[in-house]
C-alpha cells in the first residue's frame, strides 16, 4: 500500500496524536503542574485516580486521522465512540480543536486552562469520565456498551451528506445489541441516506479478559464481517509510523468506496444493496503507555484498561508516570503559554467541520418542527359516551399516516417498530410510505422498498438505537411496541433518560424532539398469547426517572389517544410513554371533551357520576380499567340504588404526584377536589397497583385509596378472565366499593356471596364455551 502521508505530515500528525494522548493522561492523573514545568511531585497527583486509559490512544489515533480526511476532502463527519470510557480522549480532542473552550470559556487554551481541564475530569463538580453530554461532539456516552452502531445508523438516516465514523470496541462487540446492529446496513439506502464507517478496534482485552473477536483467526473475522455484508479493511501494528501510513491509506480507500457506492445509487440508479466498507484496527491496548509496572506487563494487556499506574506512595510509580508523560515531549506540542503550537493547530478542521462542533452532534441546532395535521380531523364522532366501539391505535394510524405524508419532503420523521406496525394497527402509514428494506425482495412481499420510511426489524434494541440516533441528530420519530417486550430495552431507555436529564443542565445543548413510545397489544388483551406476553411493568420503570424528563399517558379511548399523540409529537426533551389498546373498545369522549380531559390530566366524568358528596370514588387509569370501572358503576347502582358515586379518570399518570414532585402534579387542593379527603377510593389501574400507592402516598386521603391492577396472574384465556384473575373485574370493583362504604356494612356478607357466585358462574361458562359470559361480552354503557 503506497504511503499517503509525506514525512512532514506524518511527523505533525504523530505530534498531534501525542498531544491528545498527553492531555488524556493528564486528565486521569494530574491536578497541577500541567506542562511538567516542575519535577512531578505527589501533590500534583489527584487523590483519587479515575478514568480509563486502555482504549484512549486508539480513539485519539483515529480522531487525528479522521481530521485529516475531513480537512482534505471537506467532509461532514461525526464521531461515535462505542468504548465511551475513553472519555479523556474525546475531551482532549475537543480541547485541541478549540470547541471545548468555546463551550466552556473557563477552560481556556493556556497553562491555567489546561490545569483546569485536568483537574475537572472525574472530579466533584467537574465532568464525568465517559463521553457524556458535557463533551462537545458527543451523541453517545458509551457508558453502557452495545449501542454505538445503532446510534450511528440512526444518525445517518436521511442525512445524505453525513459520514458517521463509529468505533466499535472489541469488548462491546460481544453484546447482543451490537451483534445485531451490524445488520443495519440492510436498511441504509445510499441514494438518500448518509454513510456509516464502522471501525472495529481490536485492542484485545476487556477489563480482565481477552475479547472473542481478537482471538479468532483473521480469516474467521473476515468471513464474519463479509457475512454481515461489509468489506473489511485491516490496519494492524504497534509501530506508530507504520500504523499512521497504513491507516491514512486505508481511510482514503474506504472513502473512495463510500463515494463510489453513493454515486452509483444517486447518479446511476443502482438499487442493489452495496457491500459497505469497514475497518478492523488492531493496535495494543494502552498503546504508548508504560510497558511494565512492578514487573508485570501493562501495554498490550488487560492491565492497561483503567489506571495503569496507581499507589503513588511508591516513589518509583511517580517516576514512572513522569517518564510516561514526558515521553510525549510536551514542550514540542505546546508553547510556553500552554497553547497548542500553530503548525499542529493547522491540522484540525475549523468551524462546523470540527467533529466536536458539528451541528449533527447537537441535533437541536438542526431541529425543525413537524408539519402536523390537525388531529381533530381524525376524531371518532360520538353521539354520547359509549355510543360505539373503535380501535384506538387504528384511529391513531390514520393520523400518523398524514404526519408521515407531511414529512415526505422534509424527510425528518420515521416510524419504528419490531415487526409490529400492522399488528399494532398503525398500518395506515403504509399507504404513504412502505417499509425500508435493502435486502432481497420477493414476489410474495408487500410494502417493502429501499425508499421506505417505516423502520421494522425484529430487534427492539435496533429500533430504540436507530430512533435515538435519529432524534439526537435533529429529527422526529415514533416507536410502537408490544407492551411486554419493550422491557428488552429497559436499559437503553435508562441511558437515554439520563442523557436528557444531563442535557437539561447544559446551556449549549439545544432541545431535541422527544422519544415517543406507544405500547399496545397490552397486558389486558394478550389473552390469546398468554402469560409471557403480559407485563405492564415498563410504566414503573419510566416512573423511576427524573420528573423533568418523563411523561406517562394512559388514554381511555381513541380521541384521547389522538390528543396525547399530537402533544407528544410537539414536545421536546422528554420521554413520553403512551399505553393504549388496539382492540375494539367503547369510546367515551368526543374530541373537544378529550382535549379538555387530556389537558388537565385527570377529571371527574360527570356524565357517569352523581352530583354532590360521593359515598365512593371510582377511579381508573387505562382503557380496560376504564371499561371495568364504568361497568362496576352500573352494577353498584343496581345493587345499591341510592349510592352516590364519583367517577374519576386519569390520563396523565404524573398528575397523581404532588406538584412539588412533578411539574404535572396536582396541588393538594385540586387533588382533594377529585378524590375527596375522607371517602373510599377504588382505583382500577392498568399496571402494577403499588405504583399508584407510590405516587399518592403523600396525599391526605391516601389511607382510603384501594388499588386494583395487574398482580402477575395470567394465561391463555378469555379477555374478561384476565381481569378476573387479577381482581380487576367489574364484580370485584363493585364488591370493593361496598366493603369500604361504612353505611353499607349490613350488605357486605350478601355482596360477598353474590360476588363468589358470579365468579363460579363465570368460570364454569368460559370452561364450557371458551368465551365470556354474554352479559360481559355484550355489555354497554347506558346513563
From Swiss-Prot:
Q: Which cofactor does it need?
A: thiamine diphosphate
Domain of life according to the entry? Bacteria
Q: Pfam families, per this entry?
A: XFP, XFP_C, XFP_N
Instruction: Give GO terms: molecular function aspect only.
Output: aldehyde-lyase activity
Q: Which InterPro entries match?
A: Phosphoketolase, THDP-binding, Transketo_C/PFOR_II, Xul5P/Fru6P_PKetolase, Xul5P/Fru6P_PKetolase_C, Xul5P/Fru6P_PKetolase_CS, Xul5P/Fru6P_PKetolase_N, Xul5P/Fru6P_PKetolase_ThDP_BS
Enzyme Commission code:
4.1.2.-
**What Gene Ontology biological process does one annotation of this record name?**
carbohydrate metabolic process
What does the UniProt keyword field contain? Lyase, Thiamine pyrophosphate
Asked if the record carries the keyword Metal-binding, the reply is no
Q: What family does the Swiss-Prot or TrEMBL record give for this protein? A: Belongs to the XFP family.
Q: What is this protein called?
A: Probable phosphoketolase
Record the organism.
Rhodopseudomonas palustris (strain TIE-1)
What phylogenetic lineage does the species belong to?
Bacteria, Pseudomonadati, Pseudomonadota, Alphaproteobacteria, Hyphomicrobiales
Amino acid at each position: 500500500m503506497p504511503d499517503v502521508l509525506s514525512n512532514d505530515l506524518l511527523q505533525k500528525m504523530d505530534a498531534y496524536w501525542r498531544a491528545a494522548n498527553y492531555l488524556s493522561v493528564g486528565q486521569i492523573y494530574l491536578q497541577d503542574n500541567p506542562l511538567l514545568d516542575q519535577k512531578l511531585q505527589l501533590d500534583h497527583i489527584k487523590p483519587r485516580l479515575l478514568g480509563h486509559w486502555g482504549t484512549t490512544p486508539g480513539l485519539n489515533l483515529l480522531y487525528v486521522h479522521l481530521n485529516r480526511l475531513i480537512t482534505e476532502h471537506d467532509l461532514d463527519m461525526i464521531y461515535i465512540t462505542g468504548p465511551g470510557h475513553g472519555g479523556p480522549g474525546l475531551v482532549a480532542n475537543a480541547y485541541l480543536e478549540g470547541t471545548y473552550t468555546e463551550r466552556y470559556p473557563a477552560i481556556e487554551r493556556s497553562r491555567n486552562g489546561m490545569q483546569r481541564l485536568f483537574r475537572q475530569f472525574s472530579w466533584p463538580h467537574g465532568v464525568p469520565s465517559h463521553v457524556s453530554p458535557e463533551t462537545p461532539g458527543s451523541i453517545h456516552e458509551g457508558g453502557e456498551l452495545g449501542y454505538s452502531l445503532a446510534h450511528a445508523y440512526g444518525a445517518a438516516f436521511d442525512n445524505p451528506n453525513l459520514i458517521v465514523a463509529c468505533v466499535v470496541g472489541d469488548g462491546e462487540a460481544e453484546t447482543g445489541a451490537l451483534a445485531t446492529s451490524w445488520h443495519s446496513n440492510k436498511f441504509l439506502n445510499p441514494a438518500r441516506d448518509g454513510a456509516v464507517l464502522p471501525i472495529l478496534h481490536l485492542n484485545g482485552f476487556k477489563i480482565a479478559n481477552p475479547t472473542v473477536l481478537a482471538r479468532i483467526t483473521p480469516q474467521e473475522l473476515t468471513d464474519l464481517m463479509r457475512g454481515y455484508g461489509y468489506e473489511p479493511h485491516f490496519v494492524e501494528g504497534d509501530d506508530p509510523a507504520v500504523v499512521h501510513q497504513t491507516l491514512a491509506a486505508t481511510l482514503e480507500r474506504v472513502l473512495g468506496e463510500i463515494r463510489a457506492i453513493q454515486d452509483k445509487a444517486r447518479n446511476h440508479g443502482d438499487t442493489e444493496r452495496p457491500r459497505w466498507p469497514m475497518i478492523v484496527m488492531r493496535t495494543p491496548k494502552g498503546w504508548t503507555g508504560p510497558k511494565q509496572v512492578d514487573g508485570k506487563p501493562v501495554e498490550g494487556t488487560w492491565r492497561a484498561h483503567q489506571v495503569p499506574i496507581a499507589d503513588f506512595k511508591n516513589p518509583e510509580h511517580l517516576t514512572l508516570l513522569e517518564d510516561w508523560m514526558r515521553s510525549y515531549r510536551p514542550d514540542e506540542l505546546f508553547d510556553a503559554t500552554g497553547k497548542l503550537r500553530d503548525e499542529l493547530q493547522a491540522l484540525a478542521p475549523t468551524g462546523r467541520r470540527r467533529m466536536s462542533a458539528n451541528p449533527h452532534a447537537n441535533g437541536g441546532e438542526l431541529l425543525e418542527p413537524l408539519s402536523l395535521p390537525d388531529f381533530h380531523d381524525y376524531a371518532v364522532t360520538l353521539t354520547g359516551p359509549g355510543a360505539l366501539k373503535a380501535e384506538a391505535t387504528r384511529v391513531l394510524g390514520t393520523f400518523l399516516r398524514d404526519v408521515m405524508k407531511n414529512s415526505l419532503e422534509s424527510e425528518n420523521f420515521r416510524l419504528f417498530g419490531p415487526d409490529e406496525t400492522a399488528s399494532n394497527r398503525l398500518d395506515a402509514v403504509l399507504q404513504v410510505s412502505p417499509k425500508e428494506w435493502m435486502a432481497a425482495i420477493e414476489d410474495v412481499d408487500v410494502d417493502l422498498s429501499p425508499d421506505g420510511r417505516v423502520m421494522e426489524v425484529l430487534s427492539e434494541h435496533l429500533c430504540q438505537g436507530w430512533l435515538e440516533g435519529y432524534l439526537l441528530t435533529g429529527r422526529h420519530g415514533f416507536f410502537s411496541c408490544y407492551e411486554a417486550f419493550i422491557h428488552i430495552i429497559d436499559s437503553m431507555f435508562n441511558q437515554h433518560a439520563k442523557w436528557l436529564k444531563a442535557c437539561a443542565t447544559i446551556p449549549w445543548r439545544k432541545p431535541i424532539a422527544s422519544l415517543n413510545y406507544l405500547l399496545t397489544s397490552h397486558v389486558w388483551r394478550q389473552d390469546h398469547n398468554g402469560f409471557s406476553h403480559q407485563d405492564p411493568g415498563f410504566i414503573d420503570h419510566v416512573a423511576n426517572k427524573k420528573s423533568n424528563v418523563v411523561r406517562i399517558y394512559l388514554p381511555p379511548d381513541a380521541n384521547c389517544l389522538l390528543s396525547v399523540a399530537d402533544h407528544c409529537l410537539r414536545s421536546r426533551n422528554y420521554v413520553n410513554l403512551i399505553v393504549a389498546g388496539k382492540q375494539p373498545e367503547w369510546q367515551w369522549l368526543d374530541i373537544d371533551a378529550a382535549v379538555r380531559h387530556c389537558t388537565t390530566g385527570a377529571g371527574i366524568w360527570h356524565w357517569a357520576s352523581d352530583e354532590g358528596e360521593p359515598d365512593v370514588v371510582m377511579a381508573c387509569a387505562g382503557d380496560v380499567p376504564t371499561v371495568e370501572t364504568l361497568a362496576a358503576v352500573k352494577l353498584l347502582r343496581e345493587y345499591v340504588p341510592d349510592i352516590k358515586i364519583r367517577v374519576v379518570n386519569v390520563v396523565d399518570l404524573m398528575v397523581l404526584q404532588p406538584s412539588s414532585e412533578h411539574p404535572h402534579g396536582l396541588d393538594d387542593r385540586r387533588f382533594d377536589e377529585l378524590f375527596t379527603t375522607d371517602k373510599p377510593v377504588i382505583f382500577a389501574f392498568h399496571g402494577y397497583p403499588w405504583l399508584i400507592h407510590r405516587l399518592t402516598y403523600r396525599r391526605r386521603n391516601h389511607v382510603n385509596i384501594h388499588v386494583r391492577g395487574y398482580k402477575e396472574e395470567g394465561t391463555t384465556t378469555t379477555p374478561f378472565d384476565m381481569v378476573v384473575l387479577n381482581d380487576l373485574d367489574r364484580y370485584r370493583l363493585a364488591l370493593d366499593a361496598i366493603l369500604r362504604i361504612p353505611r353499607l356494612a349490613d350488605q357486605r356478607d350478601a355482596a360477598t356471596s353474590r360476588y363468589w357466585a358470579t365468579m363460579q358462574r363465570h368460570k364454569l361458562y368460559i370452561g364450557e364455551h371458551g368465551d365470556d359470559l354474554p352479559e360481559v361480552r355484550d355489555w354497554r354503557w347506558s346513563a
